Amino acid sequence: MAEFYLKILLIGDSSVGKTSLLFRYTDNYFSEEMISTIGVEYKEKVITLNNRKIALQIWDTSGQERFRSITQNFYRGADGVFFVFDVTNKNSFENIKVWLNEPQVVELNSQKILVGNKIDLKEQRVISKEKMEELGVKINLVSFETSAKTGENVEEIFTKIAELILSNKSEDEVKQLYSKDKQNISIVSEESSGTKINKQCCA
């Protein structure tokens, strides 16, 4: 049984590879035919960090505009957020600031990481590592390059965000991470809104 429960969000434009990152991390699975998320996708993975069992409860949110008002309901209580863009898609990179400035995101007291995905597509790449790091400095976020296809840096980003969350909380705040509210996620209101939720768990 996990000692702590951390709620992690994957946020960004549609088709940047958020779902692929989720499945690569939790199931070590990748498919070129991954279907875009409708609503939200939820999976859980238990890791050991500093000799403690930690459950990462990971929410992959749809980047499609028509689901925006629904998926924002899932932002509440997030401990960590990945802002994901596609290094072959300039618009997805430029839209990071849009995602960062969403009111529901601004209100979050959480650790945030900038993620440039699809670095395996070297010939199609339009956003350099230097440009990504420059943005990271401007918006005060740690930045990582990843490839859901090859698995490069995927495990590292999830470990890093867990480390950041725990290192930036007081002892009392860390104790609050062991919460029944985190274990038994309430999704009744979202389900009644017609949001698709896939709940899966893997240790």
Residue locations for each model-derived region?
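Switch I (effector-binding) loop of TRAFAC-class P-loop GTPase G-domains
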Residues: 26-53
